[in-house]
Amino acid sequence: MKYAFDPDWTAKSHEIAKTLGYKWVMPDRLTVVRSWGSKTRRTIARIHCIGKVMMLGMGHKKSFYVIELITEKFDRQPQKEQLETIIHELMHIPRTFGGGFRHHDHVCSQNVKAELERYANMQVLVK
């Protein structure tokens, strides 16, 4: 597998989080990377965080999240679905921003689609 930092989607994810009012998402501790060569069949993107033990071992006190976009899958999505994917991954970040994840009982299709619609409506209001 190969990985590369994606500045465009990093900036877009920060903008989405800000627009949706996700004040707990700290832009300086969230990045987006692309990966190539994944063998996964269904995964389009995933979110990672350095575990507390690793953070402590590395001398870091603050959590850091990375959204990984599986390039072969993500790039085939229409723009609306790409936004939905990013929102889905952002919704996994808990309000504590402490290194954990919110589970799929919260990050379900219905909630993600509601957030996507809310984001789209906010974009219309801005224009």
Question: Which residues fall in each region the model found?
Answer:
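Active-site recognition of the HExxH zinc-binding catalytic motif
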Residues: E84-T96
